């Protein structure tokens, strides 16, 4: 049985089966070697410019949560779900009147936040408006079902 050779890792796999290949390709070392290879190729062709990386992680971004916690002066853990449920501050936008859960009122549109549609591809027409309206209706139906079951 032929062995699979990985050019990035410069090694042979013991078996040539799809499961072994898949687990190798998802492995930490393979991904590291893969990234290093293309980074080196980008540096060779002068494409690599570390100052233009759009998703650069800085200490400011990493410490944003701890700075916000210090500025609030609270020692409670903001990630604690139980405390958020008891707090009325955090649930203002999430509270839905259970008596209106069965009605088809559009008053709860203000409480739900919808993302804008993705931009269309150039040369192609926009999707039909029903796509966006159906998405709102699906979200309302899911919200109603979760509220009636709980």
Curated annotation (Swiss-Prot):
Ranges annotated as biased composition (Acidic residues): 103-112
Biased composition (Pro residues): 115-130
CC annotations in GO: commitment complex; U1 snRNP; U2-type prespliceosome
Zn finger (Matrin-type) start-end: 4-36
Pfam families in UniProt: zf-U1
Places the protein is found: Nucleus
MF terms in GO: mRNA binding; pre-mRNA 5'-splice site binding; U1 snRNA binding; zinc ion binding
Keyword Membrane: no
UniProt region (Disordered), positions on chain: 66-132
Highest taxon of the lineage: Eukaryota
GO biological process, one term: mRNA 5'-splice site recognition
Basic and acidic residues: compositionally biased ranges: 80-92
Cited SMART domains: ZnF_U1 (SM00451)
Major localization listed first in the record, in broad terms: nucleus
InterPro entries in the record: Matrin/U1-C_Znf_C2H2, Matrin/U1-like-C_Znf_C2H2, U1-CZ_Znf_C2H2, U1_snRNP-C, Znf_C2H2_sf
Keywords of this entry: Metal-binding, Nucleus, Ribonucleoprotein, RNA-binding, Zinc, Zinc-finger
Family that this chain belongs to: Belongs to the U1 small nuclear ribonucleoprotein C family.
SUBUNIT field: U1 snRNP is composed of the 7 core Sm proteins B/B', D1, D2, D3, E, F and G that assemble in a heptameric protein ring on the Sm site of the small nuclear RNA to form the core snRNP, and at least 3 U1 snRNP-specific proteins U1-70K, U1-A and U1-C. U1-C interacts with U1 snRNA and the 5' splice-site region of the pre-mRNA.
HAMAP family (UniProt xref): U1_C
Function, as annotated: Component of the spliceosomal U1 snRNP, which is essential for recognition of the pre-mRNA 5' splice-site and the subsequent assembly of the spliceosome. U1-C is directly involved in initial 5' splice-site recognition for both constitutive and regulated alternative splicing. The interaction with the 5' splice-site seems to precede base-pairing between the pre-mRNA and the U1 snRNA. Stimulates commitment or early (E) complex formation by stabilizing the base pairing of the 5' end of the U1 snRNA and the 5' splice-site region.
PANTHER family linked to this entry: U1 SMALL NUCLEAR RIBONUCLEOPROTEIN C
Name of this protein: U1 small nuclear ribonucleoprotein C
Source species: Candida albicans (strain SC5314 / ATCC MYA-2876) (Yeast)
Lineage, uppermost ranks: Eukaryota, Fungi, Dikarya, Ascomycota, Saccharomycotina
């Amino acid at each position: 049985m032929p062995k699979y050779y990985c050019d990035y890792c410069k090694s042979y796999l013991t078996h040539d089966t799809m499961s072994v290949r898949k687990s190798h390709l998802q492995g930490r070392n393979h991904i590291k070697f893969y990234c290093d290879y293309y980074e080196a190729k980008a540096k060779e062709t002068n494409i690599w410019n570390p100052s233009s990386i759009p998703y650069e992680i800085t200490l400011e971004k990493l410490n944003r949560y701890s700075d916000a916690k210090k500025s609030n002066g609270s020692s409670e853990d903001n990630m604690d779900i139980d405390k958020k449920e008891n707090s009325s501050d955090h649930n203002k936008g999430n509270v839905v009147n259970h008596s209106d859960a069965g009605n088809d009122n559009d008053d709860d549109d203000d409480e739900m936040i919808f993302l804008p549609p993705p931009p269309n591809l150039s040369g192609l027409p926009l999707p039909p408006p029903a796509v966006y309206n159906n998405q709102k209706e699906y979200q309302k139906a899911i919200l109603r079902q979760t509220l009636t079951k709980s």
